[in-house]
Curated annotation (Swiss-Prot):
Chief site of localization: plastid
Protein name, as recorded: NAD(P)H-quinone oxidoreductase subunit 5, chloroplastic
Regions that span the bilayer: 9-29, 40-60, 89-109, 125-145, 147-167, 185-205, 221-241, 258-278, 280-300, 327-347, 354-374, 396-416, 425-445, 547-567, 608-628, 722-742
Complexes and interactors: NDH is composed of at least 16 different subunits, 5 of which are encoded in the nucleus.
Pfam families on file: Proton_antipo_C, Proton_antipo_M, Proton_antipo_N
Record gene name: ndhF
Keywords: Chloroplast, Membrane, NAD, NADP, Plastid, Plastoquinone, Quinone, Thylakoid, Translocase, Transmembrane, Transmembrane helix, Transport
Membrane-related topology note: Multi-pass membrane protein
Length: 746
């Protein structure tokens, strides 16, 4: 066992040869390197598979031996300072290693097909390999300096991948936004590391925890300064894990390729912030004010992410805000000291969200053949719909991921979510109300995404009832419009169906888009002159096997990964696999491992949470079920006229919520107004001062000297005798002034 741990330092370096060789090959031998593109893909998957096997073996050993292993090498710079670097293997490291490698391998397989058409195929895999290497180095680091080094590398790789299609201005701006936002967090993290080193004199995790505990117990540290340093450490995870108010970069990060969105949201970029808070929890837990701040930021992010997801029309942005909300749940759990539920939720969310993102990528890949390669169209849920019979495997996988994120048993997210909700009830009733309400909102917006994407008919060919071409009828009232509109209060269905026969009614457009090999043509019946008319339309096809295989594997994870946290005894919840694995970390946090609810209380809480989720699904179904089914009941929409004033208030509320969600809570607008525009205004003023004042003085001296020289040259006629006369005159005047001041002293 000890022999195995001694070789753990090699884990981050196993995948590293691929990005290095790819970089050298593309620089020196581009033709040969590109001709072997599939070989590089296979090599990347093979090397990461080795790391996965190694990680699983370490986790199994830790379950049975319950140990923490650390190995450190010291580099002495002088007698007063030495830099130590090494690796740290504990349950948290093992969990993160498995998440990174399993999701990473599936994303690599998926990307081989998804990025096959892209000219930057090899560049993408080079970035991806370096990304996984950086994340592996981060989770195995033994001290804060190493963490910060790999923290920056993870950020750099994410910026490169977010701006992968840098020729698109939107992608380039998203890359810059992610970079600038994370600069704030990274600067805070660096200040916190330096402050903590000034207090303790060490960067090593275990030394830090022990020294800080002793200083607090002996009252030998300024608690205010220690709290400030701890908060600065927390600022880094706030930005990296997209917590309020530094969350604004995450939705725009969807401009990168979809496989990267899956990796960032499941096991790398945003998971890094949760990992660091979990790693530093023994430090934070002895500072109650910091724990409360962590939980407060978490609960705000939970609610904000859920409300901002309500009206998104871009399928990836909707999932991005969902990630933001779920990361808030994890941060809330860590702030409450619920170490095990937080990590359990990190695991279940990683596989469920990776499944959803890869599913959305499969949908986008299929839709591109119909609507073109514009993200505004291929990712727009309002142009989707009716995909169930065209992409059945993708639909099934996406439905399982959606149900998991809704918290429906026995899927993965149900088990971890319930533990956080139970702990929030004990921590704060207000936090519990918000957390439970957000669970219902999660079910609502996730099923909204599912219904708009898969149910009904393909809305690309849909024409609204006014006869004007529109993206979809959903844009009238169901939050999928490109611009703000009020609900039509005078809309009635019966007059529409009893109009003059000379007028034509069609629910589908005449225009079709460019056809590619990834489409099928089908005959569809439309309503035209109240008779039957057959037309041929083109629909998406199911994706290739290399795209479907990773989704099916993630589907299995989503179905069964929750079992690692399910107890198999009736006395308590202390004999599940996850608790057994986390025993060393739980002991380090001095938690009472016997403080668990019984099965009866668990069933009560589970019934309540599932009821909330089902209610959210029911509301989503009522609002977003296919409109065509309501044609069977012609009084459905006309019954709205009986609402009178209540209907008006309801519409105002709907538009208020829509405007809040569609405009991202006005937070981006606030940052743009208060920060971006003010900084630009200040920059313009500084530019004016620099060019007009500073440069003016410098240029003025030069121009004056030039002018005096030219005048002198003109007067003297360029004669040497005149220059000598002026020189002697200046010397004489200088001597007279010196003589005058010298004799004045006497």
């Amino acid at each position: 066992m000890e022999h195995t741990y001694q070789y753990s330092w090699i884990i981050p370096f196993i995948p590293l040869p691929v990005p290095i060789l790819l970089g050298i090959g593309l620089l020196l031998f581009p033709t040969v390197t590109k001709s072997l593109r599939r070989m590089w893909t296979f090599l990347s998957i093979f090397l990461l598979s080795i790391v996965m096997i190694f990680s699983v073996y370490l986790s199994i050993q830790q379950i049975f031996l319950s140990c923490i292993h650390q190995n450190v090498w010291s580099w002495t710079i002088n007698n007063e300072f030495s830099f130590e670097f090494g690796y740290f293997i504990d349950p948290l490291t093992s969990i993160m290693l498995i998440l990174i490698t399993t999701v990473g391998i599936l994303v690599l397989i998926y990307s081989d097909n998804y990025m096959a058409h892209d000219q930057g195929y090899l560049r993408f895999f080079a970035y991806l390999g370096f990304f996984t290497t950086s994340m592996l180095g981060l989770v195995t680091s033994s001290n804060l300096i190493q963490v910060y080094f790999f923290w920056e590398l993870v950020g750099m790789c994410s910026y490169l991948l977010i701006g992968f299609w840098f020729t698109r201005p939107i992608a380039a701006n998203a890359c810059q936004k992610a970079f600038v936002t994370n600069r704030v967090g990274d600067f805070g993290l660096l200040l916190g590391i330096l402050g903590l080193y000034w207090i303790t004199g060490s960067f090593e995790f275990q030394d830090l925890f022990e020294i800080v505990n002793n200083l607090i117990l002996n009252n030998r540290v300024n608690l205010l300064f220690l709290t400030l340093c701890a908060f600065l450490l927390f600022v880094g995870p706030i930005a990296k894990s997209a917590q309020f108010p530094l969350h604004v970069w995450l939705p725009d990060a969807m401009e990168g390729p979809t496989p990267i969105s899956a990796l960032i949201h499941a096991a790398t970029m945003v998971a890094a912030g949760i990992f660091l808070v979990a790693r530093l929890l023994p430090l934070f837990i002895v500072i109650p004010s910091i724990m409360y701040i962590i939980s407060l930021i978490g609960i705000i992010t939970v609610l904000l992410g859920a409300t901002l997801a309500l009206a998104q029309k871009d399928i990836k942005r909707g999932l991005a805000y969902s990630t933001m909300s779920q990361l808030g749940y994890m941060m809330l759990a860590l702030g409450m000291g619920s170490y095990r539920p937080a990590l359990f939720h990190l695991i279940t969310h990683a596989y469920s969200k990776a499944l959803l993102f890869l599913g959305s990528g499969s949908i986008i890949h299929s839709m591109e053949a119909i609507v073109g390669y514009s993200p505004d169209k291929s990712q727009n849920m309002i142009l989707m719909g009716g995909l169930t019979k065209h992409v059945p495997i993708t639909k099934t996988a996406f439905l399982i991921g959606t149900l998991s994120l809704c918290g429906i048993p026995p899927l993965a997210w149900f088990w971890s979510k319930d533990e956080i909700l139970n702990d929030s009830l004990l921590f704060s009733p207000i936090f519990a109300i918000i957390a439970c309400s957000t669970a219902g909102l999660t079910a609502f917006y996730m099923f909204r995404i599912y219904l708009l994407t898969f149910e009904g008919h393909l809305n690309t060919y849909f024409i609204n009832y006014s006869g004007k071409k529109s993206s979809s009828f959903y844009s009238i009232s169901l939050w999928g419009k490109a611009e703000e509109k009020k609900l039509n209060r005078n809309f009635e269905l019966v007059p529409l169906l009893t109009m003059n026969n000379t007028k034509r009614v069609s629910f589908f457009g005449k225009k079709t888009y460019k056809i590619s090999n990834n489409v099928t043509n089908q005959t569809f019946i439309t309503v035209e002159n109240f008779g039957l008319n057959t037309r041929t339309f083109y629909y998406p096809q199911e994706s290739d096997n290399t795209i479907l295989f990773p989704m099916l594997v993630l589907l299995l994870f989503t179905l069964f990964v929750g079992t690692i946290g399910i107890p198999f005894n009736q006395e308590g919840l202390d004999f599940d696999i996850l608790s057994k694995l986390l025993t060393p970390s739980i002991n380090l946090l001095h938690k009472n491992s016997q403080n668990f609810v019984d099965w009866y209380e668990f069933l009560q809480n589970a019934t309540f949470s599932v009821s909330i989720a089902l209610f959210g699904i029911f509301i989503a179904y009522c609002l977003y079920k296919p409109f065509y089914s309501s044609l069977l009941n012609l009084t459905l929409l006309n019954s709205f006229k009986t609402w009178s004033s209540k209907r008006i208030r309801w519409e105002k509320l709907i538009n208020l919520v829509y405007n809040w969600s569609y405009n991202r809570g006005y937070i981006d607008a606030f940052f743009k107004t208060s920060l971006t525009e003010n900084i630009r205004r200040l920059a313009k003023q500084m530019n004016f001062f620099d060019k007009r004042i500073i440069d003016g003085i410098t240029n003025g001296v030069g121009i004056t000297s030039f002018f005096v020289g030219e005048v002198t040259k003109y007067i003297s006629g360029s004669r040497i005798s005149f220059y000598l006369f002026l020189y002697l005159s200046y010397v004489f005047i200088f001597l007279m002034i010196l003589f005058f001041f010298y004799f004045e002293k006497f």
